[in-house]
Amino acid sequence: MAKAYKQAGVDIEAGYQAVALMKEHVQKTMRPEVLGGIGGFGGLFDLSALGYRQPVLISGTDGVGTKLKLAFLLDRHDTIGIDCVAMCVNDIIVQGAEPLFFLDYIACGKAVPEKIAAIVKGVADGCVEAGCALIGGETAEMPGMYDEDEYDLAGFAVGVAEKERLITGETIQAGDALVGLPSSGLHSNGYSLVRRIVFEQAKLSLDEIYEPLDVPLGEELLKPTRIYAKLLRSVRERFTIKGMAHITGGGLIENIPRMLPPGIGARIQLGSWPILPIFDFLREKGSLEEEEMFSVFNMGIGLVLAVSPETAAPLVEWLSERGEPAYIIGEVAKGAGVSFAGGGRA
């Protein structure tokens, strides 16, 4: 079957095998609103079953970036899909969305069924964590575009919010508090710089455990991006959140202003949260200035919530009681941009 196509580098049978292997992973993500199964031309989702009065759909798309290069080097592909889901889902939940469904796109040089299934397993694990269904996707074998052992991964998330429950940041004002939720590590940003530091400047091994890390460097760098969807759902049932920012590329400096009204900025108190060891490690090995660290990496904060001053302490206490660390990391201030004060360590 398709002998000439296979000779040209596209193995249709391998694609069929990959689909068969991924089915069990996809199935565990299903929600009652999903109509039909995988294999159709499009994924179907019954929005009316949710009972929203004025539903607003919120969508996002993203990839994993050059973190994929580390997955290639370590030949580990079962968690990178979690990163893909996290990058998309975290972007829509900060606007008030309940994640509904997800689609993935994998482009590769050679379709190895077991590898594709491992990637999709990670995507499915991320979807379960986010509470959304994996209702479709595309795996494209593209010889000549990618090396045989390389691939790219992107995703698309769609969520819904009641119109009156959208989080727009419009009510944020000077004096409001900024509460930070910890990241799990680097998440999925800054990896071009990370690879330059690790491989070109410091010439490190991914298999070694370096001080102050407690796992091999490769394992630390591949830690999946944290997904905040279920936690935020619980938070919003009890507290009023004025605005939220997903701390991705550009760090606190670039992402906090995205949730703020015009003419309003933020003052961050350094030392108000613990900096994860991986950031100190990279700063030392790369001889980086603190300003650049904060403009590239999340520095241990994956999500920032803007709340009224009287809400901040009860929110942090409530989270702490449930084993979820959170920190009051600063406040909203007049004037544009993000400034830093203080120092030391939390």
From Swiss-Prot:
Subcellular location: Cytoplasm
Principal place of residence: cytoplasm
Disulfide pairings: none
GO cellular component, one term: cytosol
Superkingdom, taxonomy of origin: Bacteria
Associated pathway: Purine metabolism; IMP biosynthesis via de novo pathway; 5-amino-1-(5-phospho-D-ribosyl)imidazole from N(2)-formyl-N(1)-(5-phospho-D-ribosyl)glycinamide: step 2/2
Catalytic reactions on record: 2-formamido-N(1)-(5-O-phospho-beta-D-ribosyl)acetamidine + ATP = 5-amino-1-(5-phospho-beta-D-ribosyl)imidazole + ADP + phosphate + H(+)
Keyword terms of this UniProt record: ATP-binding, Cytoplasm, Ligase, Nucleotide-binding, Purine biosynthesis
EC number: 6.3.3.1
GO BP annotation list: 'de novo' IMP biosynthetic process; adenine biosynthetic process
Molecular functions per Gene Ontology: ATP binding; phosphoribosylamine-glycine ligase activity; phosphoribosylformylglycinamidine cyclo-ligase activity
Top-tier EC class: ligase
Matches recorded under Pfam families: AIRS, AIRS_C
Sequence similarity: Belongs to the AIR synthase family.
NCBIfam families assigned: purM
HAMAP family tied to this protein: AIRS (MF_00741)
This protein's name: Phosphoribosylformylglycinamidine cyclo-ligase
Gene it is expressed from: purM
